[in-house]
Regions:
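Conserved two-metal-ion catalytic palm core of "right-hand" nucleic acid polymerases
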Residues: 1-205
């Protein structure tokens, strides 16, 4: 594994630094970090602290070796954030929030980068998989900007609302829909077959 181009890309200084550089864009819930990790999170805001960044990169590289070479797993914690009271059952409905320690989160992003960027040319250029998302998708779009893992949601939400407004105006004028879609968001993720997605990625999208 260590000899492969993919592994060398994942543990490269460039890839690990990019993951650290985008840190503020993917740690959505800093309050879920441990006290020590929260201190580290704020210290890593200074990307020019060479000693600290090199130390963290070493820790991340060690964790990646644990996972990729020694077949260890990342440890996750789940917190349940209360959303609302179900009027029918009287039960509190919650949204699960998954988190990990800060070094593991950076390691996960370093792994994700291998799916988003062109490994073969050893350049940080978005690859075919990252670019295959359709233009009318407004979710997590991989960003070309190093400080963002994904395009900022406010920017994508603005595009989404403009598109919805235009569609509504067209309907008002023509009384015709362009599409009719029925969605069951509750069952969306359980209905995904990871093997189909994996095969699609392996075939090169």
């Amino acid at each position: 594994m260590r000899r492969t181009k993919l592994y060398r890309f994942i543990v490269s200084d460039e890839n690990l630094f990019r993951a650290i550089y985008a840190l503020e864009s993917f740690v959505f819930e800093p309050k879920l970090l441990s006290a020590n990790d929260l201190v580290l999170f704020y210290r890593l805001h200074d990307k020019l602290n060479h000693t600290l960044v090199q130390d963290v990169m070493g820790q991340v590289r060690a964790r990646l070796e644990d996972v990729l070479v020694n077949d260890e797993l990342f440890s996750l914690r789940v917190y349940f954030n209360p959303k609302k009271l179900n009027p029918d059952t009287g039960e509190i409905e919650s949204r699960p929030l998954h988190t990990a320690n800060l070094v593991d989160q950076i390691a996960m992003v370093a792994l994700l980068n291998a799916l988003l960027f062109d490994v073969s040319d050893n350049k940080m250029i978005l690859n075919q998989l990252a670019l295959s998302l359709p233009p009318n998708f407004y979710g997590n779009i991989p960003s070309k900007e190093p400080k963002h893992l994904f395009v900022p949601w406010k920017e994508k939400y603005k595009e989404y609302t403009e598109s919805v407004t235009q569609s509504y105006e067209r309907y008002t004028e023509t009384k015709k829909y362009s599409h009719e879609v029925t969605l069951d968001l509750v069952q969306f993720f359980p209905s995904l077959n990871p093997l189909l997605v994996y095969d699609w990625i392996i075939r090169g999208c």
